[in-house]
Amino acid sequence: MTIMKKRVRKRLSPVQLIAAGFFILILFGGSLLTLPFFSRSGESTHFIDALFTATSAVCVTGLTTLNTAEHWNSAGQFLIMTLIEIGGLGFMMIPILFFAIAKKKISFSMRIVLKEALNLEEMSGVIKLMIYILKFAVVIQVIGAVALSVVFIPEFGWAKGIWFSIFHAVSSFCNAGFDLLGDSLLADQTNVYLIMVVSALIIAGGLGFIVWRDILSYHRVKKITLHSKVALSVTALLLIGGFILFLITERNGLTLVKGTFTERLANTFFMSVTPRTAGYYSIDYLQMSHAGLILTMFLMYIGGTSGSTAGGLKTTTLGILLIQMHAMFKGKTRAEAFGRTIRQAAVLRALTLFFVTLSLCVVAIMVLSVTETIPKTSGIEYIAFEVFSAFGTVGLTMGLTPDLTLIGKLVIISLMYIGRVGIMTVVFSLLVKANRAEANYKYPEESIMLG
């Protein structure tokens, strides 16, 4: 058995191990959720619905075909929370935790896989970073649970209040969007404190662990990496820019929120936060303006930062594209920012990611427009919203998910998986000779007319 495991590990590349690991975790979680033990009714759950829930949990999305509060009992909800935690932090955290407890040395091959899982340039310090991520995640989620308990314990009592606080702290930090309230934060849209606590947890989880390490260690090293500078800049741009645009398109939530000016302001800010990629909602998206829906879809498509609990195209990818565009407009060929030159390979990768992921979403919209029924009161945005939500692992919905056909469910499952694992990881895992070296010769160059 040990020899067979070693052979499998040798045959699989690091990216294939990551893709396979998430896939196996989803299948395992989905199989468990079919058991009568986890449902309130005591009956078995249909495999596709269980698989959909497991995929949504592991890929920290939040889209569900079954109501989490009504269908699953406490054991089922705990299993979903566990899948969210493992999926959010990365399944490779499990062996790291066991190795740390047992005080055993981690193999070189596992270090390579960890490097790929975190999208790191080099392998030095990868174990220290993983342990740091674990500690940071635990501390933030504990603080979040305590902050949420101020709301949930008075409302639901000690036992249920503590459980709700823990579940929603984990779901918020991991940008999952699963809720036990039945209708997300819609009934609590006037609770500014709750909205701001959830917003803080979402931002903390979506910002990226490497960025947080740079921020928290700045007082010692007085240095922030280019990755963190780009991530922080784009995150601020999207949060502030999104907030201002939602103020305009939704008139500060005048038609969406029944509350005071401050309460509407908090909800407008939340509209900018939650598409990045949490899935909690405090307003009815069916009532949102078309301009607001387009902005929400854009934010869902971009998602969070690389090396975080979020999905989507990623803020750093958008940052590189914007920097390259700025360079082109100034007549330069090199992408430069913060006194550094971005590698050409990174620019090409960003362009590839943008084209491939957007094409994937367009194809998915076309497929679902054939297989699904669009209400007479809605248009193609009804399907497009769900597609971008799934790819960005967001979890916001206009109501399509519960009524998906079998093909529709499989399409959304695939989008959630690709959005979490990464399109490049999925593609490279399917290529047998993905790491084949470039030929040592070069063809003659020739220009092509553009624009």
Swiss-Prot record:
Q: Name one GO molecular function term.
A: potassium:chloride symporter activity
The organism's superkingdom is given as Bacteria
- Subcellular location field: Cell membrane
Q: Which gene encodes it?
A: ntpJ
The name under which this protein is listed is Potassium/sodium uptake protein NtpJ
What is the consequence of disrupting this locus?
Mutants are defective in potassium accumulation at high pH and lack KtrII activity. Disruption does not affect Na(+)-ATPase activity.
Under InterPro entries, the record lists: Cat_transpt, TrkH
Name the family the entry cites: Belongs to the TrkH potassium transport family.
Q: Which organism is it from?
A: Enterococcus hirae (strain ATCC 9790 / DSM 20160 / JCM 8729 / LMG 6399 / NBRC 3181 / NCIMB 6459 / NCDO 1258 / NCTC 12367 / WDCM 00089 / R)
Which keywords, in A-to-Z order, does the entry hold? Cell membrane, Ion transport, Membrane, Potassium, Potassium transport, Sodium, Sodium transport, Transmembrane, Transmembrane helix, Transport
Q: Name one GO biological process term.
A: sodium ion transport
Q: How does it sit in the membrane?
A: Multi-pass membrane protein
Q: Does the keyword Iron apply?
A: no
Question: Is the keyword Protein transport assigned to this protein?
Answer: no
* Its job: Mediates electrogenic transport of potassium as well as sodium. Acts probably as a potassium-sodium cotransporter. Major sodium reentry pathway at high pH values.
Which cellular component, as a GO term, is one annotated location? plasma membrane
> Which is a Pfam family this sequence falls into?
TrkH
Transmembrane segments annotated in the record for this chain: 18-38, 46-66, 78-98, 133-153, 162-182, 192-212, 230-250, 293-313, 350-370, 380-400, 410-430
